[in-house]
Structures are given as structure tokens and as C-alpha cells.
Swiss-Prot record:
Originating organism: Escherichia fergusonii (strain ATCC 35469 / DSM 13698 / CCUG 18766 / IAM 14443 / JCM 21226 / LMG 7866 / NBRC 102419 / NCTC 12128 / CDC 0568-73)
EC class: transferase
Entries under InterPro entries matching the protein: P-loop_NTPase (IPR027417), Rhodanese-like_dom (IPR001763), Rhodanese-like_dom_sf (IPR036873), SelU (IPR017582)
Name this protein carries in UniProt: tRNA 2-selenouridine synthase
Recorded name of the encoding gene: selU
EC number per UniProt: 2.9.1.3
Residue intervals of the Rhodanese domain: 14-137
Active site: C97 (s-selanylcysteine intermediate)
Length: 364
């Protein structure tokens, strides 16, 4: 039997993106999992619930016996086939259950009996989760430079191009605004935090990291919130503000929110449904800020959005969207960001166009 991993190996597992065969039930996996994990459960949700009830009422021996009864015969063979295939596909991987207890040991023993020696995480997901939390707390203590600027200034791209940059919006699968959702569903809060910790560990391990470059985010990115330890450090960080011309910002927003999102929806759903999903996405974004816009202004912009979509469907041109996007920026997004920036003006250490800020960041 291969040697099992202990505490000293947990960070190395996250840094290396070690494949993890997570044998917890799907409901546990959905609540929180490690980035490189695949869910091949020993018991499904119903089986786990039945065993849990049995444990409370009759004790551990009866629960164990019920578990073996439920996962037997053809069911056991199907799951063994899946574990065997995953082990062969991921020879450097590792088994994981909730706490490194009976479930991962049972699967490990069954695999051993089938001729496959495969290690497990001693301490299970709980140990990896605690490692991720502690790593984030420690790494967040390094200095931080935030990239700020109005919508469309290319902040995310600038962060992505820095070797010490961490794309918080990319990890959260959300661009942080009313129109920020992507076609990928957001992760659970715990899974997002685990992914963030792994990304910070990998970035830190690649270089002698002196500071982090992050986008100036609010506490919430869609449905995910930043870990409090990182958020607290970000409120104290220096800010470099990108101030690009309005026309350049419009070009970026056209590319990102109209051309790219239209392409992505069509690619994912096909022409007809993809178009409907794209229209719904834009209307949902505008509707999300209806109360702040006021009903009259919202209705005006929604009418312009409908006209722009009609033109885009007929001609392929996205130019019509400027009729509602420009006033949305001028009357809502830009004033809101400038107001937020005024409250932390003393933290602004540099201002310039995109290339100037990128050059300044590299010099830090």
C-alpha cells in the first residue's frame, strides 16, 4: 500500500493540481471541493442519508453493515470500474473523503484487492480545506496593488497579464457587475475559496512574490464573496487607476458584452436558443439595476435595448447598443465608480492610460 499523505503534503497537493478522487456523496461535493477533484462517490446522497440515520439510531457497526449492503453486487462493480478508470487515468492522484476516515479507506482497500495501490489524503477534505483557509490568511499578508478604473478600462486583462496577478473575477466566474455573469455557473462559496487559495499558492510558488496585483473589487463578486482576510487587506491597499478614453472603453465593452457573449451563447445553445439566452442575459442585467435607474429611465433604456437587439438580429451589427450603453455609463456606472473612488482617494498612487498603468505595475 502506498504511503498516505500527511499535513506537510497538503499545500504541495494544491500547488501541483494533484488529481483528487473525491469519494464523498454528491451533496457534500457540491457544498465544497478542491479545484482538481472529481466526484466518484462511494455512496450516493440517498445511501449516505440512510447510513447516517442508521448510525444515529443503531451505532457504527450497524451503519457499516448497511453501507456494505447498499454498495454491493452490480452497484459496487460499477463504482469499482469508475474508480479503476480514474486511477489509471490519474496515476499521480489521491483518494479523499470527508476526514480521511472509513469511506476513503474502504475504497483504497477495494482498489488494493483489485491490484491498484492508491494513496489517500490523511485528514480528508476537511484537512485540505483548513490548509486552503490558512494559506489564504498567510498569503494575503503580502503587499497588494489594486487596479481600479471605470467599467471598460481593461482592468481584468491588465491583472491577467501580470505574473503576480490573480484574476478574482475569473476565479469567481463573474465579472462583478449587473451584466457580469458568464455561461459557467458560479462555484459554491467554499469551492471558490479553495480555488482562490490554490491559485495564490501556485502564483507564490512560481516566483519570489513581493506583492499581489488584484482588481479593485467590492466584497461580492456575483454570489461569491471575498475571504474576509483578503478583503480587509484590499481595503488598505494602494490603487492604480486606469483612465482610458471613453471611445476605447466602448470598444472593449462592445467586444466583451455583445460580440463575445453573443458568440458564447450561440456556441453553447445553438442559433435559436442561443439568441434567446443572449437577449435574456442583457435584459436581466438591465433589470437588475431598475430600481437605481428609476422606472422611467429603465423603460427608456429597455426600449433602446430591444431596438438594438432587433438591429443586431437583422444585420449582425452591435452599433445600436450604444444608444443605451452610453447613457448607462454616463448616468449610472461612471458616477457610481467615481463616488466610490473619492472615498478612498488617499490610496490612489498612480493614474494613467492602460499601457501606462501596466508599465507602472511592472516596475513595482
Amino acid at each position: 500500500m502506498q504511503e498516505r499523505h500527511t499535513e506537510q503534503d497538503y499545500r504541495a497537493l494544491l500547488i501541483a493540481d494533484t488529481p483528487i478522487i473525491d469519494v464523498r456523496a454528491p451533496v457534500e461535493f457540491e457544498q465544497g471541493a478542491m479545484p482538481a477533484a472529481i466526484n466518484l462517490p462511494l455512496m450516493n446522497n440517498d445511501e449516505r442519508a440512510a447510513v447516517g440515520t442508521c448510525y444515529k439510531q443503531q451505532g457504527s457497526d450497524a451503519a457499516l453493515a448497511l453501507g456494505h449492503k447498499l454498495v454491493a453486487g452490480e452497484i459496487r462493480q460499477q463504482r469499482m470500474d469508475a474508480w479503476r478508470a480514474a486511477c489509471l487515468q490519474n496515476p499521480q492522484g489521491i483518494l479523499c473523503c470527508a476526514r480521511g476516515g472509513q469511506r476513503s479507506h474502504i475504497v483504497q482497500r477495494w482498489l488494493h484487492e483489485a491490484g491498484i495501490d492508491y494513496p489517500l489524503v490523511e485528514g480528508g477534505y476537511k484537512a485540505l480545506r483548513q490548509t486552503a483557509i490558512q494559506a489564504t490568511i498567510e498569503l494575503a499578508q503580502k503587499p497588494i496593488v489594486l487596479i481600479g478604473g471605470c467599467t471598460g478600462c481593461g482592468k481584468t486583462l491588465l491583472v491577467q497579464q501580470q505574473p503576480n496577478g490573480v484574476d478574482l473575477e475569473g476565479l469567481a466566474r463573474h465579472r462583478g457587475s449587473a451584466f457580469g455573469r458568464t455561461l459557467q455557473p458560479q462555484l459554491s462559496q467554499a469551492s471558490f475559496e479553495n480555488l482562490l487559495a490554490a491559485e495564490m499558492l501556485k502564483t507564490d510558488a512560481r516566483q519570489e512574490l513581493r506583492l499581489w496585483v488584484l482588481e479593485d473589487e467590492s466584497r461580492m463578486i456575483g454570489s461569491n464573496h471575498l475571504p474576509e482576510c483578503l478583503r480587509e487587506r484590499m481595503t488598505q491597499a494602494a490603487i492604480a487607476v486606469v483612465e482610458d478614453p471613453f471611445e476605447i472603453r466602448l470598444e472593449r465593452l462592445n467586444e466583451e458584452y455583445f460580440l463575445r457573449m453573443h458568440h458564447d451563447f450561440i456556441h453553447a445553445y445553438g442559433d435559436e436558443q442561443g439568441w434567446q439566452e443572449y437577449c435574456e442575459y442583457l435584459h436581466h442585467g438591465l433589470s437588475a439595476i431598475k430600481r437605481r435607474l428609476g422606472l422611467q429611465r429603465y423603460n427608456e433604456l429597455a426600449t433602446r435595448l430591444d431596438a438594438a437587439l432587433t438591429t443586431q438580429l437583422a444585420t449582425g451589427s452591435t452599433d445600436g447598443h450604444l444608444a443605451w450603453l452610453v447613457p448607462l455609463l454616463e448616468e449610472y456606472y461612471d458616477p457610481m465608480y467615481r463616488y466610490q473612488l473619492e472615498k478612498k482617494a488617499e490610496k490612489v498612487v498612480f493614474r494613467g492610460e492602460w499601457a501606462e498603468v501596466a508599465e507602472w505595475v511592472k516596475a513595482q
